[in-house]
Amino acid sequence: MVIAAPASFLANWLIPRLELFEQAHPNIQLRLQTNARPEALLSGTVDLLIQSSSQLLPDSILSLPLLVERTGPVCAPDWHPQPRSAEALAALPRLHTASHSAAWQEWAQAQGISFANMAQGRALDHLSLMLEAAASGLGIAIAPDLLVERELGRGRLIAPLGFIATGYHFALGILATRQEEPELEILCGWLTQQAHEAEPQK
């Protein structure tokens, strides 16, 4: 079974959980790749797609909600000054990623605030580089909670203002004609269970 998803999702959310799947389903071999485009699913080179619900899919692909997308500022625990309010971020060095250049603007709008210079700060190509820069004390980053859960757990990063829902979610994409295939059902069911366990407890 071939799963395609963004590299940041694979590295930070799925790969840390793969051993659990292999223990539960040793007869299902998984391959991971980053060609997370609907065309790969339609051509048959990919069995399961994981992507943001903000991306449109053709009618032939069934979309199944997986994880609510929440985002928030993260920084090193000893980084100073730590922001105590959303407004305080306006004067602090912010980190950006090319893969989601509008992340800060979307977060600020959700908070009901605006920054005079939204593009202020360092721009990095990949989320992993941005998070490493944040952990190294180079500024404050903006990232989904599910992609920083390991770094938060290890104490390399903190989320001083918490996370807020973006209105989107990560979703599973499968061909509608294949939804009853046993291995796909097992895989989708396992991913859904893992997602449920990862959701913050209310």
Stretch-by-stretch model annotation:
Residues 1-57:
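Central regulatory/effector-binding core of bacterial HTH transcription factors
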Residues 2-4, 49, 74, 95, ...:
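Short, well-ordered beta-strand segments
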Residues 5, 116-159, 165:
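Hydrophobic hinge/microswitch elements
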Residues 7-8, 77-78, 99-102, 128, ...:
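Alpha-helix/helix-capping structural signal
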Residues 13, 57-58, 101-107, 124, ...:
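Tryptophan-centric aromatic hotspots in well-structured domains and transmembrane helices
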Residues 33-95, 99-102, 108-123:
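Acidic, Gly/Pro-rich loop/turn segments at junctions of secondary structure
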